[in-house]
Amino acid sequence: MFDKATAEDFARDWLAAWNDRDIERILSHYSDEIIFHSPRIAKVMGKDIKSVFGKKALRDYWTKALALAPQLFFELDDILVGSDAMTILYTNHREELVAETFIFDPDGRVARSVAAYR
């Protein structure tokens, strides 16, 4: 069972890693077989794709994304908790509301993640 305290710890560490621009700390939350979906992937990667598969591809995507967003900052708005999943609601440096949902594997790493923007 995924509880509120575990979700809060994850969210705070995840947001801090992003705000510190620490790609290795960010990636430490994810399984090697991560599947990540975001409407931003196509713009950043310059290809008509909506998902990345695997930690190496995720590292490549986020390295480019961080380079394109020197003012990146995420502010926590709320956390929603499910049985083996959670959603972090946050406001980004562009003042956009973002909902990022994480589904965890049995080892507590993110196996699938979906980002949605207002």
Model-derived features: positions:
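Hydrophobic pocket/interface hotspot
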Residues: 14, 26, 34, 58, ...
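Short, low-complexity N-terminal intrinsically disordered segments enriched in polar/charged residues
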Residues: 1-28, 32
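A beta-strand edge to alpha-helix "cap/lid" segment located at domain peripheries
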Residues: 63-118
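A solvent-exposed, acidic/Ser-Thr-rich amphipathic alpha-helical stretch
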Residues: 4, 25, 31-77, 82
